């Protein structure tokens, strides 16, 4: 099984790395003076600017950039909220689904606008086709484009010197959508349709079962209702944009959302495709490709470590089964391991790899149920989120988060040798460190605060369906997921309540936009600084030494913050299994 695991993970990484250079180079050109494919995309881009009255040549101060971004996303949230509340009276609702409740609509609007895609509802029984397409799918595009725009603003701040502007938000948003996200989503959605992913406006179909079954109360069930809908178009961008919200309740474990091994591989690859390629884009835009490779190496090493942990823990199986004499070890006749909550068509390796990739990348989609993982298997995706979603992370947001950690790393290195820290020729001073501290602390505070409120209040405990350490893990996972804009969940928590919808919605908004503003502030501050020539005392930020330092900073800051909480959840649960 070890060789099988290595081969499957190796193929995935090889294909991913093969896509980094061409896509990264293309995206660097998109954000340059003369983007590619202007003959096709140029007229569409110019038409949008003309209709909206945008001066594409006018650049913005970081404060104006932030105001435009916040205003755009606030309007998007209001529209999505209103669409959900009115869906019962709108077309493309063949199942005649009622309006979404106020608290659930708020939570969903906050979730999709913040690129979290946390879902406290079941998509096929809650959202009409119009809401899925016009509301959720549109936000999948623009929330991803928002993250990419912030990243490009930060990169410009690092690369430029003695200027007060970092670009134009409207141009960056438009180009991210038209030149990058839409073409990739179109290709992927058509490919997914070829694999059997549904794309139709037909209502749900009731079919006769070939083999009727008798349920627990003795009733014979001879029919099944199969949910349909325009799923492929939403699934493509939910993966490419690291959104993660599924069309169906069980997300990519659903046979009509992820039917074949090829669809599984393509959806998995799509999660990391843009975040990985943006590292190369970063290197090109700052004039040193080695910087991009160093960041990519850091992300890949951390991801591999947690993937090995998850695969090993799941393949080892459940100690409780072994005590009962159940054989769950790999052999010629069975795959072995902990297959509870997993699709046998994907197996342990593809399930555990997806679990770590989706939580490393702030995607949150699932092809297995994380709540059914072993304690250490569930700890791996939880910790990847708690690191701040910087191990690849969301499109744009992951890389700008890792660049903040890089700034902290050079600051720590500067303290150790008594030099003023600098990153890519720019001095890192008090203002940058204050903003970086905010970016690091806000998700941690929100995670621990919401966990504490939930476990200490009757409303929070009422829908925790497991007791003890695992029940605590479910609450901690939900708070971690919302506060780090991931969206995955331990499904044993009943989260579609006013309590969780409200608190998790607040966490998603705070952790998204309270991080974006200080990131843009750092971009503006760095853009106004002069370039410092390199000297013998300059810390190279492209070497294996710096990669090791950066990994250490990410792990120490993330791990130390949450060790007490993890000790009450997955760690103690693991120890109890061994008793």
Curated annotation (Swiss-Prot):
Q: Where in the cell is it found?
A: Cell membrane
Chain segments annotated as transmembrane? 1-21, 64-84, 135-155, 178-198, 265-285, 293-313, 398-418, 435-455, 503-523, 549-569
Q: Name the gene for this chain.
A: kdpA
Alphabetic keyword roster:
Cell membrane, Ion transport, Membrane, Potassium, Potassium transport, Transmembrane, Transmembrane helix, Transport
Q: What does this protein do?
A: Part of the high-affinity ATP-driven potassium transport (or Kdp) system, which catalyzes the hydrolysis of ATP coupled with the electrogenic transport of potassium into the cytoplasm. This subunit binds the extracellular potassium ions and delivers the ions to the membrane domain of KdpB through an intramembrane tunnel.
Q: One cellular component GO annotation, for this chain's record?
A: plasma membrane
What is the recorded membrane topology of this protein? Multi-pass membrane protein
Recorded hits in InterPro entries, A to Z, give: KdpA
GO molecular function annotation = P-type potassium transmembrane transporter activity; potassium ion binding
Q: Please report the name of this protein according to its UniProt entry.
A: Potassium-transporting ATPase potassium-binding subunit
- Source organism: Herpetosiphon aurantiacus (strain ATCC 23779 / DSM 785 / 114-95)
Where is this chain primarily localised?
membrane
Q: Which family, according to UniProt? A: Belongs to the KdpA family.
Q: Please name the PANTHER family in this protein's record.
A: POTASSIUM-TRANSPORTING ATPASE A CHAIN, POTASSIUM-TRANSPORTING ATPASE POTASSIUM-BINDING SUBUNIT
Summarize the subunit comment: The system is composed of three essential subunits: KdpA, KdpB and KdpC.
Q: Name one Pfam family in it.
A: KdpA
């Amino acid at each position: 099984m070890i060789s099988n695991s290595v081969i499957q993970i190796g193929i995935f990484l090889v294909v991913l790395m093969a896509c980094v250079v061409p896509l990264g180079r293309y995206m660097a050109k998109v954000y340059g003076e003369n983007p590619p494919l202007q003959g096709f995309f140029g007229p569409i881009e110019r038409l949008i600017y003309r209709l909206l009255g945008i001066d594409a040549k006018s650049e913005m101060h970081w404060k104006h950039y932030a105001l435009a971004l916040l205003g755009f996303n606030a309007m998007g949230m209001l529209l999505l909220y209103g669409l959900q509340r009115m869906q019962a009276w709108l077309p493309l609702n063949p199942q005649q689904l009622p309006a979404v409740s106020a608290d659930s609509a708020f939570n969903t609007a906050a979730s999709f606008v913040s690129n979290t895609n946390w879902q406290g509802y079941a998509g096929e029984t809650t959202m009409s086709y119009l809401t899925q397409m016009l509301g959720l799918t549109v936000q999948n595009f623009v929330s991803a484009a928002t993250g990419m725009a912030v990243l490009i603003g930060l990169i410009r701040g690092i690369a430029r010197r003695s200027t007060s502007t970092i670009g134009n938000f409207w141009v960056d948003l438009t180009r991210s959508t038209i030149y990058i996200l839409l073409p990739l989503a179109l290709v992927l959605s058509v490919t997914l349709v070829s694999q059997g992913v549904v794309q139709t406006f037909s209502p749900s179909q009731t079919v006769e079962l070939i083999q009727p079954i008798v349920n627990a109360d003795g009733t014979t069930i001879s029919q099944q209702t199969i949910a349909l809908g325009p799923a492929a178009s939403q699934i493509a961008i939910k993966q490419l944009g690291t959104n993660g919200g599924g069309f169906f309740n069980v997300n990519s474990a659903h046979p009509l959302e992820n039917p074949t091994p090829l669809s599984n591989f393509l959806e998995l690859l799509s999660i990391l495709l843009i975040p990985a390629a943006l590292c190369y884009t970063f290197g090109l835009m700052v004039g040193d490709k080695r910087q991009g490779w160093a960041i990519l190496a850091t992300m890949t090493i951390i991801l591999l470590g947690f993937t090995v942990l998850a695969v090993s823990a799941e393949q080892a199986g459940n100690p409780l089964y072994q005590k009962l004499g159940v054989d769950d070890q790999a052999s010629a006749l069975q795959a072995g391991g902990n297959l509870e909550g997993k699709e046998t068509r994907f197996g342990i390796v593809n399930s555990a790899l997806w679990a770590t990739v989706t939580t490393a990348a702030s995607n949150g989609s699932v092809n297995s149920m994380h709540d059914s993982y072993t304690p250490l298997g569930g700890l791996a995706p939880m910790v990847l989120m708690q690191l701040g979603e910087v191990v690849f992370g969301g499109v744009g947001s992951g890389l700008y988060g890792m660049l903040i950690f890089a700034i902290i790393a050079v600051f720590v290195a500067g303290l150790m040798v008594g030099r003023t820290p600098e990153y890519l020729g720019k001095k890192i001073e008090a203002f940058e460190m204050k903003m970086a501290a905010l970016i690091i602390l806000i998700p941690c505070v929100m995670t621990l605060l919401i966990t504490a409120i939930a476990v200490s209040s009757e409303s929070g405990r009422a829908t925790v369906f497991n007791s003890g350490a695992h029940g605590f893990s479910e609450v901690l996972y939900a708070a971690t997921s919302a506060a780090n804009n991931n969206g995955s969940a331990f499904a044993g928590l009943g989260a579609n309540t006013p309590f969780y919808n409200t608190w998790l919605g607040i966490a998603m908004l705070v952790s998204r936009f309270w991080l974006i503003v200080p990131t843009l502030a750092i971009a503006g501050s760095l853009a106004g600084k002069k370039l410092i020539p390199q000297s013998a005392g300059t810390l190279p930020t492209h070497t294996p030494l710096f990669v090791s330092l950066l990994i250490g900073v990410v792990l120490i800051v993330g791990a130390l913050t949450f060790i007490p909480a993890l000790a009450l959840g997955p760690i103690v649960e693991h120890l109890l299994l061994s008793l």
